[in-house]
């Protein structure tokens, strides 16, 4: 039985796993099936300008690690530190989240090319802050001036460049006292005596070329541990569920880590005002990366800034790139269009806030492969590892363009969360393919299509009226049972009629005498029972008058059983007589049990009638033995047994008397 249960469980898990794999490796056409056919793209010269000015090669740049910035978020929101990396420092780096370390590369080479990016004309930090405050205050985008600039960016069609940016997004360095000390930015708070600050916050690695004309910020992504407590997993999970779920990880499996209370009273409804307020809290990664970017640009005011990130670091990088119009390359980032919409990131004329997936010329490029369910936007089933670990990845739409390696078709990979790690992407994907994949937009993509969002400014009042209903039902029932069964009467017949305002009272008296107790009750039960019942209806309320006469039998039973069984007598025959009296409320039943089976002269039994304790048979004659009158010897033998071993039928063999020699 246990083996069968395990087999069924294995089959269920196999089916669930197969279904999750098929859904995770969705093609672009399958993802478009969830889109809205009513989306109309706004007119504009974007594509014409882009085609009129093809990308130009701008040579190769060599980057070196210059600084590492760390910005606190939850436990230390005011912490902002940096450490300068000296040119002679020999560092160790890990590409698999601290499992193994190797000598860090000294230089990173990447090719540059020109591209056109559509962004705001005025992008100072104060200008960006004013635009976002306007949206959060009035719920409408601010009227600002936009421009299309030709800038330098990484060459996304070059394999070595893509590989370099993946390494910048993946690295985690080990520092020693010889490499320098962590210094507070702008003389900030001193956290020297606090332990654990390095596990709280966002870390960015700053790379610069020889002329300091271009700076690359590589942001650290989500820690790989499923459960809280390892590295920055707890804080990363909170931001993942804020950015990637439809409503703060509510309305899904119970394992999801809920990060706010914005769900509506009905299913698939969410308070958008509450949702935006949760994202605006100072401790979240978007605001931390804005402060980090502000300090880097103050240190390199005349440099172009490029961004790179993996997983959550890639999402934060793309949000920063959309805000300031910066070239960005991300790796295995989960869909980020939903987060950009809720943060109120500015959009050019002709686009409403929330349509970032339909915008061209953003400068955002997301690299990933089809075997990663997080990147594909399908790691959200109840049995998926993301849901088991508490992550709620419900979005399916990326901003900008997606550049997808089809590892399921080309390499025969199976879909699994283990392929999400950046070390797997670097060694098994980017280095294996000869060229990077082509990049494209998914303009018809729609997030959370089955959810309804409503606005709430906190002034609405809700009035509810309670209604009460009173009903009284009385059931009158007459029963006569002739064939009692194991759990009740087998031939039960019932008549019932509902009435209103009816009261019923009854009294019963019983006398029982048992001579032969059985396994589950008395075998020769003799019972005398009298019962009376009355029903009355008040005269205040007109109602039908119902009179019920109930009579219970008075029975007399005599039983003699020679072959008792496990649950009763096997040789029982019953004769029942009853004398009905129409004018009486009771009837008398006489039951006589006669046994007609093989002789069994047992007169004393124990153990519920199963064991005979009579002495061995002896002669019944009262005369003394003589040569003509000898005692009779009888041999008792069992001819048929029960399934549990006791004798069911006996046989007695008589022997002729023998004369004394």
Curated annotation (Swiss-Prot):
Membrane topology designation: Single-pass type II membrane protein
Catalytic activity: a triacylglycerol + H2O = a diacylglycerol + a fatty acid + H(+)
Residue ranges of the region described as Disordered: 492-559, 574-597
Enzyme class: hydrolase
Main localization category: membrane
Residues of the active site: 311 (charge relay system)
Stretches with biased composition (Low complexity): 493-513, 527-559, 574-595
Pfam families named among the record's database cross-references: Lipase_3
Claim: Glycoprotein is one of the keywords in the record: yes
Biological process annotations from GO: multivesicular body membrane disassembly; neutral lipid catabolic process; phosphatidylserine catabolic process; piecemeal microautophagy of the nucleus
This protein's UniProt keywords: Autophagy, Endosome, Glycoprotein, Hydrolase, Lipid degradation, Lipid metabolism, Membrane, Signal-anchor, Transmembrane, Transmembrane helix
Positions of transmembrane segments: 4-24
Induction comment from the UniProt entry of this chain: During starvation and plant infection.
Subcellular location: Endosome, Multivesicular body membrane; Prevacuolar compartment membrane
Cytoplasmic topological domain residue ranges: 1-3
Glycosylated sites: 155, 190, 212, 271, 295, 457
Gene Ontology CC terms: multivesicular body membrane; vacuolar lumen
Sequence ranges on the Lumenal membrane side: 25-661
E.C. code: 3.1.1.3
Single GO MF descriptor: phospholipase activity
Main function: Lipase which is essential for lysis of subvacuolar cytoplasm to vacuole targeted bodies and intravacuolar autophagic bodies. Involved in the lysis of intravacuolar multivesicular body (MVB) vesicles. The intravacuolar membrane disintegration by ATG15 is critical to life span extension.
Assembly and oligomerization: Binds to both phosphatidylinositol (PI) and phosphatidylinositol 3,5-bisphosphate (PIP2).
Family stated for the protein in its record: Belongs to the AB hydrolase superfamily. Lipase family.
Stated name of the protein: Putative lipase ATG15
Top-level taxonomy: Eukaryota, Fungi, Dikarya, Ascomycota, Pezizomycotina
């Amino acid at each position: 039985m246990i083996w069968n249960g395990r087999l069924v469980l294995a089959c269920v898990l196999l089916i669930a796993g197969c279904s999750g794999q098929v859904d995770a490796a969705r093609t672009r056409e399958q993802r478009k099936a969830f889109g809205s056919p009513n989306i109309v793209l706004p007119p504009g010269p974007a594509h014409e300008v882009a085609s009129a000015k093809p990308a130009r090669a701008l040579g190769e740049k060599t980057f070196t690690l210059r600084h590492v910035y760390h910005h606190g978020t939850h436990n230390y929101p005011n912490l902002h530190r940096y450490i300068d990396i000296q040119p002679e420092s020999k560092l160790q780096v890990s590409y698999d989240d601290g499992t193994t370390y190797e000598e860090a590369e000294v230089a990173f080479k990447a090719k540059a090319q020109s591209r056109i990016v559509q962004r705001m004309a005025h992008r100072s930090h104060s200008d960006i802050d004013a635009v976002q405050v306007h949206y959060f205050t009035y719920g409408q985008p601010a009227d600002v001036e936009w421009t299309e600039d030709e800038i330098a960016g990484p060459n996304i069609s070059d394999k070595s460049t893509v590989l370099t940016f993946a390494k910048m997004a993946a690295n985690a360095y080990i520092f020693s006292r010889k490499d320098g000390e962590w210094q507070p930015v702008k003389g900030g708070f001193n956290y020297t005596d606090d332990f654990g600050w390095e596990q709280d916050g966002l870390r960015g690695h700053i790379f610069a070329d020889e002329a300091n004309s271009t700076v690359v910020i590589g942001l650290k992504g989500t820690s790989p541990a499923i459960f809280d407590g390892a590295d920055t997993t707890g804080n990363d999970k909170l931001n993942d569920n804020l950015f990637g779920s439809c409503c703060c990880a509510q309305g899904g499996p119970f394992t999801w880590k809920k990060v706010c209370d914005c769900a509506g009273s009905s299913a698939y409804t969410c308070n958008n005002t509450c949702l935006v307020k949760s994202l605006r809290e100072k401790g979240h990664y978007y605001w931390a990366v804005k402060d980090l970017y502000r300090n880097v640009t103050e240190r390199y005011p005349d440099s172009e800034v490029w961004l790179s990130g993996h997983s959550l670091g890639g999402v934060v990088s793309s949000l920063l790139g959309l805000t300031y119009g910066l070239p960005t390359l991300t790796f295995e980032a989960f869909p980020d269009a939903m987060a950009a919409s809720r943060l109120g990131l500015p959009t050019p004329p002709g686009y409403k806030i929330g349509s970032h997936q339909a915008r061209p010329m953003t400068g955002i490029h997301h690299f990933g492969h089809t075997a990663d369910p997080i990147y594909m936007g399908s790691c959200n089933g109840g049995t998926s590892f993301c849901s088991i670990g508490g992550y709620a990845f419900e979005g399916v739409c990326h901003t900008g363009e997606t550049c997808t390696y089809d590892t399921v078709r080309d390499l025969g990979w199976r879909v699994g969360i283990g392929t999400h790690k950046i070390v797997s992407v670097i060694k098994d994907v980017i280095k294996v393919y000869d060229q990077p994949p082509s990049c494209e937009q998914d303009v018809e993509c729609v997030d959370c299509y089955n959810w309804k969002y409503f606005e709430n400014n906190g002034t609405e009042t809700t009035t509810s009226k309670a209604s009460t209903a009173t009903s009284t039902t009385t059931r009158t029932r007459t029963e006569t049972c002739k064939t009692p069964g194991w759990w009740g009467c087998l031939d039960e017949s019932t008549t019932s009629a509902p009435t209103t305002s009816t009261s019923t009272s009854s009294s019963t008296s019983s006398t029982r005498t048992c001579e032969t107790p059985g396994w589950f009750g008395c075998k020769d039960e003799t019972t005398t029972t009298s019962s009376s019942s009355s029903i009355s209806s008040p005269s205040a309320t007109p109602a039908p008058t119902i009179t019920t006469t109930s009579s219970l039998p008075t029975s007399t039973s005599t039983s003699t059983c020679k072959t008792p069984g496990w649950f009763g007598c096997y040789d029982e025959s019953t004769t029942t007589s009853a004398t009905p009296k129409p004018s009486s409320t009771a009837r008398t039943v006489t039951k006589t049990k006669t046994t007609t089976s093989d002789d069994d002269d047992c007169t004393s039994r124990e153990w519920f009638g199963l064991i005979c304790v009579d002495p061995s048979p002896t002669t019944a004659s009262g005369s003394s033995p003589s040569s003509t009158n000898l005692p009779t010897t009888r041999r008792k033998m069992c001819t048929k047994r029960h399934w549990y071993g006791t004798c069911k039928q006996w046989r007695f063999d008589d022997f002729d008397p023998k004369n004394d020699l």
